[in-house]
């Protein structure tokens, strides 16, 4: 008599004993392809947005120092 929690070895591999899955139809393959293209475009746009935000912050970090320092330099030039 098997105790609760005991699993027969044949039961473990039962899922793999059914053989390979049948080939997908042309509509399914087209939907898969469309989904992967959408996924690639979506991830590309996310990466471009992240790069744009990072570069924008770095640009303003450099320009901000230059813009804040400009009035002082103008005053020095006037004196």
UniProtKB/Swiss-Prot annotation:
Cellular component GO terms, alphabetical: membrane
Membrane topology: Single-pass membrane protein
Segments passing through the bilayer: 35-55
Highest rank taxon of the organism: Eukaryota
Record key words, sorted: Membrane, Transmembrane, Transmembrane helix
Localization annotation: Membrane
Protein name: Small integral membrane protein 40
Species, as recorded: Homo sapiens
